[in-house]
């Protein structure tokens, strides 16, 4: 019996533990979920909840109407955000194997930043210290995440451009970084497994480009 329970732990057959929380580190039901959310006591991965704000979702004019932000501007804003968060966390806490940002719209996933460190102790220290910090005018909410294999967490239909659930899909829609930034960040140290897929639809990113004033205030 014990072997059977262990074999179904975190799967759809498990009637006690939430399979979505086990795979994705988040569940749309939150505390109201009928199944248990077993938060890890140690993990290589942390999640910074709702940290990234897509300007296409938040840009408004003074009268409350939405203003247009081009895809190129959004990618540049995102690359700046990704580079700053990745660089600062790696410099302060230790080597990062992988960092991913959700582009979903559901409250439990929107703007979540998942950072997988090489060492569990680095992840633990990051959670403790980051929960006392602010970023871009908002308090940082960090916790250890059960996610270690993002291949199990991602929406395969989204990656093929076929997801019919849109931004409210319950699997991760990971926003890609530009190819140039990927080489810049993941080429600094030993080759890491499964870095974020590069975005090839925009012009190459210039290194050391001047950041916008709003972005300079985003530091932890």
Swiss-Prot record:
A zinc finger (C3H1-type) spans 12-40, 149-176. PANTHER family: U2 SNRNP AUXILIARY FACTOR, SMALL SUBUNIT. InterPro entries: Nucleotide-bd_a/b_plait_sf (IPR012677), RBD_domain_sf (IPR035979), RRM_dom (IPR000504), RRM_dom_euk (IPR003954), U2AF_small (IPR009145), Znf_CCCH (IPR000571). RNA-binding protein that function as a pre-mRNA splicing factor. Plays a critical role in both constitutive and enhancer-dependent splicing by mediating protein-protein interactions and protein-RNA interactions required for accurate 3'-splice site selection. Acts by enhancing the binding of U2AF2 to weak pyrimidine tracts. Also participates in the regulation of alternative pre-mRNA splicing. Activates exon 5 skipping of PTPRC during T-cell activation; an event reversed by GFI1. Binds to RNA at the AG dinucleotide at the 3'-splice site. Shows a preference for AGC or AGA. This is Splicing factor U2AF 26 kDa subunit. The lineage of its organism: Eukaryota, Metazoa, Chordata, Craniata, Vertebrata. SUPFAM superfamilies: RNA-binding domain, RBD. Residues 186-220 are annotated as: Disordered. It comes from Bos taurus. Interacts with GFI1, U2AF2 and C1QBP. The modification N-acetylalanine is found at residue 2.
């Amino acid at each position: 019996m014990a072997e059977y329970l262990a074999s179904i732990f975190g799967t759809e057959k498990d009637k006690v533990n939430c399979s979505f929380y086990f795979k994705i580190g988040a569940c749309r039901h939150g505390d109201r979920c009928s199944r248990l959310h077993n938060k890890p006591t140690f993990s290589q991965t942390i999640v910074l909840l709702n940290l990234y704000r897509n300007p296409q979702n938040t840009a408004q004019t003074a009268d409350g109407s939405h203003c247009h932000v081009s895809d190129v501007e959004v990618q540049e804003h995102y690359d700046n955000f990704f580079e700053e968060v990745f660089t600062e966390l790696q410099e302060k806490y230790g080597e990062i194997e992988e960092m991913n940002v959700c582009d979903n719209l559901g409250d439990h996933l929107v703007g979540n930043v998942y950072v997988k460190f090489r060492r569990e102790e680095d992840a633990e220290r990051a959670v403790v210290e980051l929960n006392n910090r602010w970023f871009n005018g908002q308090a940082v909410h960090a916790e250890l995440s059960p996610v270690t294999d993002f291949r199990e967490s991602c929406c395969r239909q989204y990656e093929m451009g076929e997801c019919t659930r849109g931004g409210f899909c319950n699997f991760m829609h990971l926003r890609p970084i530009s190819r140039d930034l990927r080489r810049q960040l993941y080429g600094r140290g030993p080759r890491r497994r499964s870095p974020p897929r590069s975005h090839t639809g925009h012009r190459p990113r210039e290194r050391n480009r001047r950041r916008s004033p709003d972005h300079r205030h985003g530091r932890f």
